[in-house]
Structures are given as C-alpha cells and as structure tokens.
Amino acid sequence: MPTPAHLSKDPRYFDFRAARRVPETHAWPGLHDHPVVDGSGAGGGPDAVPVVDMRDPCAAEAVALAAQDWGAFLLEGHGVPLELLARVEAAIAGMFALPASEKMRAVRRPGDSCGYGSPPISSFFSKCMWSEGYTFSPANLRSDLRKLWPKAGHDYRHFCAVMEEFHREMRALADKLLELFLVALGLTGEQVAAVESEQKIAETMTATMHLNWYPKCPDPKRALGLIAHTDSGFFTFVLQSLVPGLQLFRHGPDRWVTVPAVPGAMVVNVGDLFQILTNGRFHSVYHRAVVNRDSDRISLGYFLGPPAHVKVAPLREALAGTPAAYRAVTWPEYMGVRKKAFTTGASALKMVAISTDNDAANHTDDLISS
C-alpha cells in the first residue's frame, strides 16, 4: 500500500485539502472568456434551465423542447426515493473522505476505464482538474470496488448495497425516459414498441457510474473541476449535491448557464450518440463543472449507452423524409474519433457527419474556448 511519503511524489495524486494556492499544473486559461448567468429562472428569462416533470401528461412535449433547444433539462417526478438519493450522496462523501493511501489502492491504470483518479478525459489535456473521481460498471460493481476495500468489510458491503439499490432504480428510470424520448420524437406507442422489438435499445443499454468530488478551492477563478465536453453515449443522469457547479454552454450570445441545485431533481444531458440516433433533432450539450472557495461539491453521473458491438445510426423514424446526417458507428469507434478530436481541436460529431453542410450535424458541435 502506498504510504503518505510516497503519495507526495506520486504524480497521480494531489492533496487538495493541503493546497493553499492553485499551482500552475491546475491553472486553466480562458475560463472567463464567456459570461456566466444564473439558470434558476428567478427572472423568468431565456436562461432558465428547462424542467421536465415525468408525472405531467405533457412531459413528452417538454422533453422535445428541452432536447431540441438545450440538450439538457432538470428532471422531477422521477420516482427515485429522496431518502435513497441522500444515502447515495452520503456514501460518496464517505468514500472520498477515505485516506489517500486507501483510495490509491484502486487508482485507474493507463488504458483502464474503471477505478479512482482524475476524470477519464484528463489524459487529453496538459492541465489537471480540481477534482477526484471514481468510475465503475454497475454490472461489475462488487469486483470493481474490492480494489478499494480488499477485505470486503462493513464499509464495502454498505457502499455496494447502496449503489446496487440506486442502480436498480436508475436502470428502470432509464427505460422510462428512453420511451419518453422516443415519444418526444413523434413516435406513436406502436412505433416505440416496434423500435424496441427490432433494435432492443432499452433491453441492451449499458450503464456506467462516475462519482465526482470537487474540493473547495483557494482560487476558484483559476481552477476547473471538469473541462467542457459533451457526453459520448445516449444520455446521462446527473445527481448533484445542493452546491451549484454544473454549467451548460449556450449560444447567441455565448455564455455559461449555471444549473440550479434543486432538491430531489436530477439533471439529464443528451449525449453524442443520441444526437446521432435522433439525426440531430436532439442535440448533445457542452457542459463543465466549476469549483468554489467555500464548499466541497459531490456529483454522480449515470451514463447510458449501447453495447460495444452495436452500430448506432439515425433511426428511420427520426428522419422524417430527410437524409441521414451521420454514418453508423459503434461506441468504441466513436470514442476513437473523439480521441482524435480532443488532440486536434476538431469536432467528433462533424467527423462522423455524412455531410458537413447538414444543419443537424452542425447544430451545436462547434468547439468552444473554455
């Protein structure tokens, strides 16, 4: 097991608690190139983050508007017990409060997708982010977490039980939201059933969970919790603590909109592969996480996407007489494209677009300075 002395020299570990300043390794330029506005809707303006209530008979229409205009929305009435969400947040806080030497037992190795460490996309950037993360697959939850708790004691069993309960609730919710998305595209109940019977999207969707801890920062104007990006999969549920920090990018004029921390609500982000599946009618959203001087922040991303071998292409029901804007790709193929995009500054969605002149392919995938 790594000792504290060894950790101080390990480039994979940074002691945020001991930091009295933001070192150059964690200082990001260009963070304030665009203004930041409040997304709570207090003034009733155009920057109010859309809210979808799944109990509302008109929820599909609300999803359609939000997915077309924002690529994200706050989800209420989802049915996941609030006391479970509180237990999930407490479990995450407890995990990140473990001694560094214990967390480093589960450090993510090069090429691995699961484990403890910096955000997975951090390898594409020269600067470090002001956060710690832990990624695991719900399908392999207990084996993944044995790296953190090799003795499988009480803390391990409690954490696994909470996350397994959360996964069951979220997987059921994902199926309901997928159906709502398809209805929002204009599909009838029969068409939704036919799509599922033919393509088995809901049946085969895979899930990944990524836990985030954003420590309070001595100089938040120079640091960034998570770099601006889009999610690669179908869609993501984000559970965040009552400390705001998630921001969505909006055009016309360019600005960052801070998502309000609403008790009991989740954030839903549309991903790149869902933009492809819907032929650009629903679009993915650039988002980032910022830090603050006074409070730690916790979030959990529950990512949904297709199995690795499945080709994702625009649904014919989404074409509505228009040509397909994107070629078919598997998730691993698309991740390879994203890797090239990160290193060249290009747009991954444009790289898989059939025609770069197609409005759907170019809706929101221009890169931004952040």
From Swiss-Prot:
Catalytic residues in the record: R297
Top-level EC class as recorded in UniProt: oxidoreductase
Residues binding Fe cation: H229, D231, H287
Annotated GO biological process: gibberellin biosynthetic process; response to light stimulus
Annotated keywords: Dioxygenase, Iron, Metal-binding, Oxidoreductase
Record bears the keyword Nucleus: no
SUPFAM superfamilies cross-referenced by the UniProt entry: Clavaminate synthase-like
Signal peptide: none
PROSITE patterns recorded: FE2OG_OXY (PS51471)
Methyltransferase listed as a keyword: no
Family: Belongs to the iron/ascorbate-dependent oxidoreductase family. GA3OX subfamily.
Descriptive protein name: Gibberellin 3-beta-dioxygenase 2-2
Species this protein is from: Triticum aestivum
Gene label: GA3ox2-2
